[in-house]
């Protein structure tokens, strides 16, 4: 491990030196000296030198408006380069993630030691299902332009790791690194315009093209090797346990920019991109598959005896089919009237069948070494990505469906659906779902909002089957919320049964989730329609914002536990869909820990989880990182299903109920009930300024003028991460633990920490947040930005944080934070030296910006850069 630290530190200092040279060349010695002085003061301040801390503050406060931007950019870019070095070291030959695939082999050994039979292991592998849902959360601050350059920096670091480089080769790589660092410095890191939903979708396709396209088959190849060595099992060509879905272009919850027309466009664009990528694959196969020997069936398919190279012939036919489909889709995207080709690709079988026929023929003719090369990779891509490339989820808020149906019932003279009781709503919906006649009149002209809801359902109905994965209903509260969507889809003429997933996301809704699903499963029509399969989405970010992280995580656990048992009893296969964020206040946690901390049985129906904004780049930004992330997920799911965690003891559950109540009261006491809290929040964080950042296509608020409750979960977390108080990720949790310790429950808490993965993960997550939080910086924001009358509130919160840290260390039996994860502690320490000056500078800039009559472009731009820089330093935004 130490070897890895020193290798990483030397790369970090090399990249830092290259950045320094670039700054000196661009802006002269004076600015570089200024940056270097600040860096040294920051390092010394971190080591506890109080005089240097004061000097750091005065140096940053006294920067002229012309110096602000270069200094902010220097530290921000440095943190981006540090993240690249760290990502590289996590996958370098001796790094931690490089061993994830080997960890699978160790897992199989452990499973065998537990006396699990090879048959049981093979069954678990054959049922494996991982669906990762990419979302365009506005937290990916880094521009795509810069991401490409940073990816190439990673490639250079990997080339430098070869021991046998000649001097001229090393010089060539170093020259390229200099160019990349200079290009990044001379590129504006802040977007000038908000991305449109279509830009976001293109960003998602770029992740597929640049990373997943190579990463998924490479992972399956490694996984297959482990399986053959460990349990004598080979993955069949058609077994691809990994799939990707996207919310980009489908998630319209609170985002008026995502319309039915946008969804239609993104579906076409996605198919166009799939044609593009598969054409490249087939092009390679045309040159590779020059063999002449084949089975009689394949020869007939290729055109009979006169065809010399049957495999090539089939690949060429497929290539022309892909190209004509792509041309048709391009015409549609441009809005032209185009003739549909007779062999238009609409489903995966059209791609799979000819490719698999070639695969079987090569196997039959003794050429399996060729069959299992590039051709197998392409077959696996057909199974993973296929004709749609990524499927999309449509997400809409429950009240939009209620309002649409109410408008219809009023028009038809049936009364006002919105004012009916739940029982009356259900009776009406079930009657209409059973009815053979349409409900929506042809000549009806509804309001624009209702028209939009109906049009979205029509887009789903027209889309080729398999291109839409699910319809998610946010803020779902009642059975009628689910039935309403089924009725709207039926009215749109949807020819297939689309999974409709209620999303339970506030504390009350999580507590009622089991009741709602029990009622639904007792409805005969519903039981018949779902054919034994149900998806339910659990919301992490909104529940944490509503009740605090301790109460929310316990409500999520209990809801999942109850749903698993209810569905098991009803004989329904349940897929739990986890809406986790990247940050801990939004349910984020290292994948392995998060999955093993769920209730027993929660992964039987496979894993479906959102991968958000900035986390997509950290987990799937490079093919090698993709392999490592997928290996982690695979291992965790197999372990959770084959060695499920024990059911928590009764007294542990009772103690969690108490912790949850105490922590929720404390959290809401501040956030909802303290009249000073919202003014303090707005002053002490850059919340108002964040609204100006052109991050995502979605507005930061559900309602333009509401308080904290109307803020989306992401800006809420983002703002507190910036001022280093990290409040949403801990407030209330420590208070609950302190009460329990006072009540003499410390031994019990320690036992829970040792023996219950759910609880130990909660404690580990608190430690991680505490390690990133910083009391003196949070206090500095107060001094620079907050009215003196609100200072006592800030002091109270910081005192609470300090005592929370003590109680968590006591329960975990740790001498200091992150004792069990020295790699992460090292990484945070390394970054703090560069993040601290950005925080101090940000507080200064907020102070200047709020004092100005007229905004100064230099101050505004530098402020945006510090926000991006702190986000890079914290490794997550919202």
From Swiss-Prot:
Record bears the keyword Lyase: yes
GO molecular function, one term: phosphoenolpyruvate carboxylase activity
Coiled-coil zones: none
Residues annotated as catalytic: 137, 545
Keyword Membrane tagged: no
Assigned protein family: Belongs to the PEPCase type 1 family.
HAMAP family with a match to the protein in the record: PEPcase_type1
Name of the protein in its database record: Phosphoenolpyruvate carboxylase
The gene coding this protein: ppc
């Amino acid at each position: 491990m130490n070897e890895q630290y020193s290798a990483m530190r030397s790369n970090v200092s090399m990249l830092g030196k290259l950045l320094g040279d670039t700054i000196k060349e661009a802006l002269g010695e004076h600015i570089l000296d200024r940056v270097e002085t600040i860096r040294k003061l920051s390092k010394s301040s971190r080591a506890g030198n109080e005089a240097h801390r004061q000097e750091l503050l005065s140096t940053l406060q006294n920067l002229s408006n012309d110096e602000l931007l270069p200094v902010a950019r220097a530290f921000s870019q440095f943190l981006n380069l540090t993240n690249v070095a760290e990502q590289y070291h996590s996958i370098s030959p001796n790094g931690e993630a490089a061993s994830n695939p080997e960890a699978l082999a160790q897992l199989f050994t452990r499973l065998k030691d537990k006396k699990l039979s090879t048959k049981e292991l093979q069954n678990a592998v054959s049922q494996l299902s991982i669906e990762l849902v990419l979302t365009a959360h506005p937290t990916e601050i880094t521009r795509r332009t810069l991401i490409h350059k940073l990816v190439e920096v990673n490639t250079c670091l990997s080339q430098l790791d070869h021991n046998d480089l000649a001097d001229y080769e090393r010089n060539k790589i170093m020259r390229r690194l200099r160019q990349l660092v200079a290009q990044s410095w001379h590129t504006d890191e802040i977007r000038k315009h908000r991305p449109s939903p279509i830009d976001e979708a293109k960003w998602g396709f770029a992740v597929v093209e640049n990373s997943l396209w190579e990463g998924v088959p490479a992972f399956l190849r490694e996984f297959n090797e482990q399986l053959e060595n460990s349990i004598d099992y080979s993955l069949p060509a058609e077994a691809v346990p990994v799939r990707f879905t996207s919310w980009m272009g489908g998630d319209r919850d609170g985002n008026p920019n995502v319309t039915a027309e946008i969804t239609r466009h993104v579906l076409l664009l996605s198919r166009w991109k799939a044609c593009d990528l598969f054409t490249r694959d087939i092009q390679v196969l045309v040159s590779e598959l020059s063999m002449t020997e084949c089975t009689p069936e394949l020869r007939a398919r290729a055109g009979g005896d006169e065809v010399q190279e049957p495999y090539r012939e089939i690949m060429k036919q497929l290539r022309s089919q892909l190209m004509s489909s792509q041309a048709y889709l391009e015409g549609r995207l441009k809005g032209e009237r185009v003739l549909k080709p007779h062999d238009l690709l609409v489903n995966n079988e059209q791609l799979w069948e000819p490719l698999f026929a070639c695969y079987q023929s090569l196997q039959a003719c003794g050429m399996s070494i060729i069959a299992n090369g590039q051709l197998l990779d392409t077959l696996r891509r057909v199974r993973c990505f296929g004709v749609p490339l990524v499927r999309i989820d449509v997400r809409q808020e429950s009240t939009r469906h209620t309002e649409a149906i109410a408008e219809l019932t009023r028009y038809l003279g049936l009364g006002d659906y919105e004012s009916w009781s739940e029982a009356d709503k259900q009776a009406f919906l079930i009657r209409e779902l059973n009815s053979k006649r349409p409900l929506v009149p042809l000549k009806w002209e509804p309001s624009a909002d209702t028209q939009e809801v109906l049009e979205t359902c029509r887009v789903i109905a027209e889309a080729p089957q398999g291109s839409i994965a699910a319809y998610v209903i946010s803020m779902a509260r009642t059975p009628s919320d689910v039935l309403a969507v089924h009725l709207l889809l039926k009215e749109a003429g949807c020819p297939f049964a689309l999974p409709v997933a209620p999303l339970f996301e506030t504390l009350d809704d999580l507590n009622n989730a089991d009741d709602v699903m029990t009622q639904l499963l007792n409805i005969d029509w519903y039981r018949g329609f779902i054919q034994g399969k149900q998806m339910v989405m659990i919301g992490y970010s909104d529940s944490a914002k509503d009740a605090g992280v301790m109460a929310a995580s316990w409500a999520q656990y209990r809801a999942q536990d109850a749903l698993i048992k209810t569905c098991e009893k009803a004989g329904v296969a349940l897929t739990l869909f986890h809406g986790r964020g990247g940050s801990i206040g939004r349910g984020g946690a290292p994948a392995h820990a998060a999955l093993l901390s769920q209730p027993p049985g929660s992964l039987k129906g496979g894993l479906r989880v959102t991968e958000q904004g900035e986390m997509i780049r950290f987990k799937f930004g490079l093919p090698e990182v993709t392999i490592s992330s997928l290996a982690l997920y695979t291992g965790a799911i197999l372990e959770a299903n084959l060695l499920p965690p024990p059911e928590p003891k009764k007294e542990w559950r009772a103690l969690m109920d108490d912790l949850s109540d105490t922590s929720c009261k404390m959290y809401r006491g501040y956030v909802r009930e303290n009249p000073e809290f919202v003014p303090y929040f707005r002053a002490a964080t850059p919340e108002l300024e964040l609204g100006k950042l052109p991050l995502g296509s979605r507005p930061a608020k559900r309602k333009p003028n509401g308080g904290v409750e109307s803020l989306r979960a992401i800006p809420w977390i983002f703002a507190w991460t910036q001022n280093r108080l990290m409040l949403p990720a801990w407030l209330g949790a420590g208070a609950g633990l302190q009460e329990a310790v006072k009540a003499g429950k410390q031994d019990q808490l320690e036992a829970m920490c040792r023996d219950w993965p759910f609880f130990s993960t909660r404690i580990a997550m608190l430690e991680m947040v505490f390690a990133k939080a910083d009391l003196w910086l949070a206090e500095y924001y107060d001094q620079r930005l907050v009215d003196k009358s609100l200072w006592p509130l800030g002091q109270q919160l910081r005192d609470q944080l300090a005592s929370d840290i003590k109680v968590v260390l006591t329960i975990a039996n740790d001498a200091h934070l992150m004792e069990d994860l020295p790699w992460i502690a090292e990484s945070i320490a390394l970054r703090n030296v560069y993040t601290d000056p950005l925080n101090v500078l940000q507080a200064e800039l907020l102070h200047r910006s709020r004092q100005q009559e007229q905004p100064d472009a230099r101050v505004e731009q530098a402020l945006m850069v510090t926000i991006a820089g702190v986000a890079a330093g914290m490794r997550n935004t919202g």
